[in-house]
């Protein structure tokens, strides 16, 4: 069975070797990314996901200043492997910062007390779907990306530097750009160990 949705999923891979040469305009990328998040479902239609796109100097500042300084103070051994990784991220075109609005999450906890213990989980599920939606949308435009998680180490400085709300919780950083080298075939584990199909009660 041929399915365009699954085909787009198959194009979405973790790509580390990226460059800053893209044919798309920044406005086109903004529309693509923000639309993907807007169309992502969320529990109770809470729409808790927030995003900030870093282009140009803002993208460089994140990786060359904020993340580098933070990790430099934590890594006690050889810093060169980390340095090389950060340089690779900086060479990409941009970064999407994914946040969740905890003020909205808290409001839904109060409005729906029966489900209050679940809203943190609901929020994280919504964010995960938004991240996948953006990642896949970029892949369909032949734009590579890798998902990073330097939170919570960089949260405070990111929010302070760009004057973002304190109640936004940073969950991930999606680095994207043109693909210099595509990864090899993805290893997929056996379905026998992962899935079941049932038809009898």
Kindly give the residue locations of the regions a language model identified.
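C-terminal helix-cap and adjacent tail motif
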Residues: 4-17, 170-201
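Short, hinge-like loop/turn segments at secondary-structure boundaries
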Residues: 69-70, 163-166
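N-terminal amphipathic, basic helical "cap/leader" segment at the start of enzyme domains
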Residues: 1-94, 199-201
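Small-aliphatic-rich amphipathic alpha-helix that forms the alpha element of a beta-alpha
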Residues: 37, 102, 112-160
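Short acidic/glycine-rich loop or secondary-structure boundary segments that cap or lie
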Residues: 61-63, 104-108
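Active-site-adjacent structural patch at catalytic or cofactor/ligand-binding sites
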Residues: 92-103
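A general secondary-structure junction signal
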Residues: 53-55, 100, 178
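Short, flexible, mixed-charge acidic loops at enzyme active sites
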Residues: 66-67, 108-113
């Amino acid at each position: 069975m041929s399915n365009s949705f699954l085909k787009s999923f198959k194009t979405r891979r973790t790509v580390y070797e990226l460059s800053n040469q893209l044919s798309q305009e920044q406005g086109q990328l903004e529309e693509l990314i923000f639309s993907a998040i807007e169309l992502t479902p969320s529990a109770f239609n809470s729409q808790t996901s927030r995003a900030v796109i870093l282009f140009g100097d803002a993208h460089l500042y994140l990786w060359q200043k904020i993340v580098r300084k933070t990790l430099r103070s934590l890594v006690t051994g050889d810093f060169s492997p980390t340095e090389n990784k950060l340089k690779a991220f900086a060479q990409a075109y941009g970064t999407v910062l994914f946040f969740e609005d905890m003020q909205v999450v808290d409001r839904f906890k109060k409005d729906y007390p029966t489900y209050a213990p679940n809203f943190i989980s609901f929020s994280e599920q919504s964010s995960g779907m938004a991240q996948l939606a953006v990642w896949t949308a970029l892949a369909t435009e032949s734009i590579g990306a890798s998902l990073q998680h330097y939170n919570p180490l960089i949260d405070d400085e990111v929010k302070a530097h760009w004057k973002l709300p304190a109640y936004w919780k940073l969950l991930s950083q999606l680095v994207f750009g043109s693909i210099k080298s595509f990864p090899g075939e993805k290893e997929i584990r056996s379905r026998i160990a992962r899935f079941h199909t049932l038809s009898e009660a």
